[in-house]
Structures are given as C-alpha cells and as structure tokens.
C-alpha cells in the first residue's frame, strides 16, 4: 500500500515538472489535431506464457500536438513499464494464466489525462510486432471468391470485426478499412454499404467512397449508445449489376473511460449490533459504471473508505472490500449509548482504483445489545392493602435502563422471589416499563397482617455480558375491613314432610363472623322463598314452616324445594352472607287417583269399552294398586273394571243405551285406601262399534238437513231482493234542464271610430240611466197573498248635467228601499247581444219565452236558498 502511494506521488510530481518545462515550447496546434493515443487499444501477442524481465512487448504512440518529445507514462499494472518513446517492457517475471489487460495513461501539455488499453495475449503464431501493425496500417477487406458450377460451396469467409475506439478525435471523416473486389481488374467496380449506421438508424455514421472502397467514419462513436455496428458491403458494375455477394462487416466500438461511476443510492443505510466481534459484516454499497468491465478495466470498480465520523473509539473501525463493496467491522468498542451512529464517506473508482471516482455516504446505526441491566429506583416500597381484595394494585415499581426504549433489551421482566401461597402477582406496563404488583388472592387480616416481598428485575432479552440483578423490597400491610358473615355449612339439607304444621321447626341455621376482634350481632333473613312456605327467626336462625308445604306444587322440583338464606352483621358497613337451604319434601297421601279422559263418546250399537287411564299425584306407596267402583246408581247401567296392569280401567254399558248424555260416578282408591270420586261424562250416539265422533245436536232440535233447507230458502230470498233493488236503481231517469235556451235575439254591438269631438269621459247618454229604472221585469206570483205597499218615488232625470250626481244617489237609495224589488235569486232576463257573445251561456236562464213543459220539482231538493224558486215553478203543478 505504501509503495503504491509513493509511486503515484512520484508520477504526479514528474508530470508537473514536465509540464512546467514544456509549456514555453508549446506551439500552435496543428489544424484539426487533438492530443491522444493513436489507438484506444493495443494488443500485444506473445509466443509463451512466461515472460522474462526486460522483454519488449510493443510500442504505444501518443501525440500531444506539440514539438516536444513525450516521455512520462503511468502503467496500471506494476509488472510492466513504458519507456519515454512508448516501448512497453516487462518489469519483472510474469506468468500468464489468461489474457492480461491493463491501462497506460499520460497527460498532454494542458494537463489532460489520456488513457489506452493494453492486452497481452499468449499466441505462438503471432508476434508483438504483428499485433502492433494493426494500429499503424489500415486493413483491406477483399470479397471472397465465388464458385460456380455444381461444386459444393465452401463455408463463407469469416471477416474479423473491425475495432474502432469511441470518442476518437479525428479529423473526420476518418478511414477505417478498404473494401476491394478482385473483379476490378477487369471492370470498373463501385462500392456501397447498407445496414446499421449507414442507411439504417443511426444513419450517416459510416459511409464508403464508391470508387475506391474506403469505408469512413464520419463522427466520434459512443460505445454506451451503440457497442457494435453490423453492415453489409456491396460491389456492383457500371450498369448496376452485382459483381460480388454482399459481405457482412462488423464494427466493434472499443470502450474508453469516459463515464464516471455512480452509486446506486444517495445514502446507504445499515446497522450493526453493539458488542459484536471484529470481522462482522455490516452492510454493502454498490455503484455502476456505464463503461466496459469485460474487455477493459474502464468499468471495473474499486471501493474505499475516505472518512469515518465520529472517529471514536478508533479512527478505522470499519473496512470495505475493494471489489464487492461489503463493509465490515475491524475494531472493537461499539457502544450505542455513546455513539449510536457512524457516517462513512465511501468512494468508488473505476480502472480498479486508478480512474474516475465518485463519493457516497453510508450511515451505520448501532443497534442496542442488552449490556445495561435495569435498576430499581427506589429499591424499597411500602403499601397498604385492604383484605379480601382480588386484583388490587398494591404498588408500581420503577426501573431505569440505559438500553434503547421499546427493545427487548429495555423491556423489564419482574419476578417475586418468595411468593408463599401465591397471594401476589406482578406484570410489566409496556408503556412505562414499570412493574405492577397486584393481589392474586384475597388477603385475610385475621390470618396475616403483613407481607415482605423480594422482587427482582431482568430484561426480556438475556444480558450480552455478565451483569448484576437489581432487587427491590416491598412491605405490604393488610388493612382490616368488615367482612361478611357466612353460614356453616354454606348449603344445608333437611327432610321435611309436606304435611308440616304451621310453626313447626325445620332447622336451626348457624352463621359465623370472620371478624373475630369485632363483636357484632348477626341477623337472619330469607332471601328467596318462591312459595312463601318458610319463616326464619331473625335472632337465632330457627326456620319454621307456614303449614302450606305441598310436594305436588310447581315450586318443588324432583321432591326438593330450594330457599336462599341471608345473614347480616351490624357493622358500619353491613356485611351480608348467603346460604342455601334445600328441603327434601316427603310425600303424604293427600291425593287420590283420578281417571282420564273425563269426557268421551260411545255408540249405542255394540259399543267398545272406553279405556280410562288412572293417575295419582302422589308417589309410591301412596299410588297403585288401585281399586275401582261405581256409585250414585251408575252401576245400574255401567260397568267398571281394571286392566291387567292395574294402571287403567275399562268402562262399558251393561245395557243398550239411548242417545244422550250420561254422568258416571267413578270411585277410585289407592293402595292406602284413599278414595277419590270423579264424575265422567259420556255421550251416546246413534252408531255402531267404536264411536269416533258423534253428530252434534242442533239448536231447536232440528236435524241438519232441515237447517240446510231453511238456510237455502233465506239465501234465495235475499238474492231476489238484491236483484229487485238493483233493477230499480238502474231505471233510467230523464232529467230536464232548468231553463231551455232561447233563440239569440240579443242586440248587436256596433263599434264607432269617431275622432275628435271632445273627451270620451264626457260623452254619455243620460237617458240610459232612466231607462234602466223603468224597464224592470214584471214578476207575478200566485203562491202567496201579495202585500200592498206604496210604490217608491224615483226622481226624474235633471236637465242640468251638474245635478246628475245627486240624481244617481237619490234613485239608488230609492231602489235599495223598494219593497217591490225582486229577491237576489229571482229569475232575470238579459238582453240579446248577438251570437258569439261571452254572455251566451246565460241564455238558458231565460225560459219566459219557452212554451215547453218542464218538471222543476227537483228544485225543492236544493235547499232553503232555492225554496222560493221551487215555489214559483212548482205552484202550477200543485194547482192542477
């Protein structure tokens, strides 16, 4: 490493001195000249795989477009060196396992670096001079000979690809290769090319001199855009006829180091756990280079670390693999609590570290390891806990842990060192990391008044290094509270007969108070007595019966009756205890056997015996065997007997019975001779054999057919009545109109188009006012006696137009008070105004000129408002 740095420093220093010496001698650049190597790649072939020191491989040509002699070269492989004239020599013994490639670089007069690629190939049939001749002499490609006739055609010639360096400096167009045909010895031949870079995109990159066959490149090539061009060359005669088969030409673009590497990410992030051993891989960085990394070193990258921040505890904690970019730990002392993060400045350089470079950033997070133990703070606690409380929070214990919060290395795990009886439990609060101490069982003040607990704490993750365990002491004092009394035993069972008399003692309950140091009085109560059969003495707990016990009650299940008992003390906070009293009710023969069913039907002809099932609410021995007999004279017409099993009875008539209902008195007795009289109702029907259903008697004693005939007759009469009513409703009634229309005899209206002659509001005819008062229609009534009243006095029309207002007011008042004026609902006659008038619809009201007879009796149905009108038009009919 030191020798390489020293060599690079000496190269740079020598280059600087040379530049200072040659700057005064720099002449003007030759027109079109650009500094650089004559070729982007040199291939030196050797005839052996082992090269001795001092062996000459070839020569490179470099021109910086000045008159000075160039003599400083930088060789990318330390096994070779370059003389000032460009001769490449073997610096030390070299053994070739495969083709060796390296780069030779130099600087022009302006300080710009130029590079060329060198390839050393082991080929016995080629010499270094032959390989070098490719760069100094342009090749000539000749069309292969064509064969005619029936001879089998040999395989086509394989034309070696033409190599052209990218970014060449010209001048352009620049000759690449000459295409020749052997036919040009006899005839004039013209050449052309087709394909990619010629007539296909990218067009115009290559062209050919159509007479000489020189193939030219017109501009610099870019390998990153197109790394290969495939073209076809053509040869034709003067008349355009092909003289050769098309020949394929491949042009490979040789890469130059013209692209800087690029990191695949702006910032690389990784992590490593504190306390890990050296050699642990942390992360990897990666970069890309668009240059060739297969046939040259231009795209071969080398990685390095330029800077570490912070440089603690040592400057070089990390290293990077030059080829893969994997960053590993090489030092010790990672401590997240001191330095939780490291930032590395990394560099990627092509040409295996001798070319273009780019810098990037890698951030390494130091993850937590459990290298810090949790510590109680404080380490002693006291707590007061009421007795009998389950799940009561006794105390919260706090710890401090320097590890990263939220990680298993920080999460605390608490344990109770001695937990006799399992009275306590401790859990961890996930948010605060506190230990929550609770009661798992109820504490009893009378048994133990204080507990001293030792609690330890660790982490969910084991310690990465040996660490001491922290311990806390919790002193728990039990607080005495009023506890509820309890029954002894909690469940009492007693056998009691169902005929228990009222006030008879059943049991004396016993309860105890756990508060021994408190003298308290106990009281007894009944909590739940569904049937209200029991009574308890409040002071001594003696339970007595009310005389109502019944084993056959719905409250008794499986001969047991359950009662909830309560006991209380007289403390400040009353405590209540609960007990259970279970009574096993003993049976008493208080129920006689009864038959079922109690209603049945039977035929009067050859009846089958009726089977009646016998049941008894009591239990053996107060049930079967049963005895059956008939009483109250039922044995005269009926017979009863038990079946073979003795659980049912057969009831049958002793003689033929008439239709009707019969009451049978059945007397049943159980094994203890407890009798039970039951009345069974039998209905005898007119049938034979087994009676399934008798026809019920109808009301009034009629048979069913008679009732059906009566109902049919009533229904027929009802239908006939409805049809008659419908016929009357559908009878057509011709209604006459109230008034017939008369012929249109109204006067026509004329329109006058007068112009001038004064204002229109003063052009009126006063005679029309007088005419309107005198032309009232005469209305004659013959239905009432007329009342003679003086006629009103109307003022005549004044001659002076100025008095027309008084004339109107006075005559209007006289008309309002005229007793002879017709009512508002009187028939009015309107003047004829000609056909088409809007008032034509009122013409039907004028019926005075009609001689037709009309029936106006329906006016009487219109109410009191039309009564007078009905009297006027209906009076003639009454007189007739």
Curated annotation (Swiss-Prot):
Bilayer disposition of the protein: Single-pass type I membrane protein
Localization terms from the record: Cell membrane
Transmembrane spans: 704-728
Pfam families tied to this protein: CADH_Y-type_LIR, Cadherin, Cadherin_pro
Stretches assigned to the Cytoplasmic side: 729-880
Topology feature Extracellular, residues: 156-703
GO annotation, biological process: adherens junction organization; calcium-dependent cell-cell adhesion via plasma membrane cell adhesion molecules; cell migration; cell morphogenesis; cell-cell adhesion mediated by cadherin; cell-cell junction assembly; homophilic cell adhesion via plasma membrane adhesion molecules
Stretches the record annotates as Disordered: 790-826
UniProt cross-references to SUPFAM superfamilies, sorted A to Z: Cadherin-like
Glycan-carrying positions: 61, 343, 382, 400, 425, 428, 469, 471, 473, 475, 558, 562, 576, 578, 580, 681
Disulfide pattern: 603-687, 685-694
Manganese in keyword set: no
Recorded superkingdom: Eukaryota
Keywords per UniProt: Calcium, Cell adhesion, Cell membrane, Cleavage on pair of basic residues, Disulfide bond, Glycoprotein, Membrane, Metal-binding, Repeat, Signal, Transmembrane, Transmembrane helix
Molecular function GO terms recorded: beta-catenin binding; cadherin binding; calcium ion binding
CC annotations in GO: adherens junction; catenin complex; cytoplasm
UniProt domain Cadherin: residue ranges: 156-263, 264-376, 377-487, 488-593, 594-704
Range of residues in the leader sequence: 1-28
Proregion span(s): 29-155
UniProt free text on domains: Three calcium ions are usually bound at the interface of each cadherin domain.
Subunit structure and binding partners: Interacts with CTNNB1.
Role according to the record: Cadherins are calcium-dependent cell adhesion proteins. They preferentially interact with themselves in a homophilic manner in connecting cells; cadherins may thus contribute to the sorting of heterogeneous cell types.
Protein name: EP-cadherin
Annotated source species: Xenopus laevis (African clawed frog)
